């Protein structure tokens, strides 16, 4: 069993990269990919943990992107097998992501003020505890203030899509995300395709064709929140379009307590057999560089 999608404290997870590797060993995983949101910051520690672990540790990332030319809600692109050195292309993209996230955070605080909630950036930084600040930390600051009872309550009332303090983040195009992943020798995977909007199988197929045309290598067919039917449909799309199937739990630790590493809600089983094709794709890219 393998898990090619999880998050650490370098983004919005509650386990450090080292703790994730230890947990993967306890779970009996053959391979684990660390795919933090829009950052490479946890990969150094992840690689060091790999030195003494029987688990194959695969350096990765998850990049949020938006295609301005269609109405799709957005694509999350996972990069697997990233090289040790960040490419100039990836560094530029990371800087854009940082600037966009910081601008969004300030805009959210301004909207909260407009609704009578004076929340300072210092309070949010305290809630983040040194992590990259995002909406979950603003939510925690609202909990700390007593404005809401829970993080989920903060999203339901203020921070979720369509709520009073929601601010859409400026995102790179999927072409840019895929190219940045390839610039580091990585394999580009469309993450959790059936969870980003209420789309038909036909529509998902159309999106897969579009992404394949701009360089996508694979699609996350196995995913913690995919139904059995969705897994089947995703595998059929991969076969039809010529994409490699991938899969993972999207484990965040305490942030999503119902999702466990390796097994998701308990039914996830990402087969070891898909790893060979993904590694072959990585090797093919390396030989072409």
Put a short name on every predicted segment.
Residues 259-271:
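Conserved, well-ordered active-site substructure
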Residues 49-210, 268-288:
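Extended substrate/RNA-proximal surfaces in nucleic-acid metabolism proteins
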């Amino acid at each position: 069993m393998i898990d090619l999608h999880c998050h650490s404290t370098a983004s919005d997870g509650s386990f450090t990269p080292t703790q994730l590797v230890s947990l993967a060993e306890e779970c009996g995983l053959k391979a684990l990919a660390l795919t933090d949101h829009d950052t490479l910051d946890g990969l150094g520690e992840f690689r060091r943990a790999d030195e003494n672990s029987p688990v194959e540790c695969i350096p990765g990332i998850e990049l949020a992107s938006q295609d301005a030319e269609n109405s799709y809600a957005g694509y999350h692109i996972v990069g697997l097998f990233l090289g040790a050195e960040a490419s100039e292309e990836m560094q530029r993209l990371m800087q854009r992501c940082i600037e966009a996230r910081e601008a969004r955070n300030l805009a959210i605080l301004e909207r909260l003020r407009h609704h009578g909630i004076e929340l300072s950036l210092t309070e949010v930084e305290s809630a983040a505890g040194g992590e990259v600040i995002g909406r979950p930390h603003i939510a925690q600051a609202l909990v700390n203030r007593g404005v809401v009872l829970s993080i989920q309550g903060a999203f339901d009332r203020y921070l979720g899509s369509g709520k009073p303090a929601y601010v859409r983040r400026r995102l790179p195009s999927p072409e840019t995300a895929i190219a940045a992943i390839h610039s580091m020798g990585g394999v580009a995977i469309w993450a959790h395709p059936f969870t980003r909007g209420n789309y038909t199988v036909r529509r998902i197929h159309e999106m897969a064709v579009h992404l394949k045309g701009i360089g996508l290598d694979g699609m996350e067919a196995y995913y913690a929140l995919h139904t059995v039917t969705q897994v089947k449909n995703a595998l059929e799309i991969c076969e039809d379009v010529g994409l490699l199937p991938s899969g993972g739990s999207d484990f965040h630790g305490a942030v999503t307590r119902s999702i466990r590493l390796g097994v998701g809600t308990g039914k996830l089983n990402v087969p070891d057999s898909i790893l060979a094709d993904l590694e072959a794709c990585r090797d093919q890219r390396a030989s072409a560089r």
